[in-house]
């Protein structure tokens, strides 16, 4: 499980609302992207075009997507909810 994100300084460095890129690394399975998008639609509804790249051995994949965020707390919430998915290993 990924460590919870809290007490960040996003509010000091970004003007909201703004697009924010998230990169999620997890175990390669057919449901990872769907699980991520399902959670993200609840927190930040929108149309997403995730970019998925498999690892060289095919055991992992990275999912990159851009979401419109409204505050630093919104970014933290997205990090915390998605990082709690069972197959997620790292999130940037």
UniProtKB/Swiss-Prot annotation:
InterPro entries: UPF0250_YbeD-like (IPR007454), YbeD-like_sf (IPR027471). Belongs to the UPF0250 family. It comes from Pseudoalteromonas translucida (strain TAC 125). GO terms for cellular component: cytosol. This is UPF0250 protein PSHAa1021.
């Amino acid at each position: 499980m990924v460590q919870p994100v809290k007490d960040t300084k996003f509010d000091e460095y970004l003007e909201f609302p703004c697009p924010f890129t998230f990169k999620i690394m997890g175990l390669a399975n057919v449901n990872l992207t769907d699980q991520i998008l399902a959670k993200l639609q609840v927190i930040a509804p929108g149309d997403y075009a995730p970019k998925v790249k498999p690892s060289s051995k095919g055991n992992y994949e990275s999912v990159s997507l851009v979401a419109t965020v409204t505050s630093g707390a919104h970014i933290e919430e997205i990090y915390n909810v998605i990082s709690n998915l069972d197959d997620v290993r790292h999130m940037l």
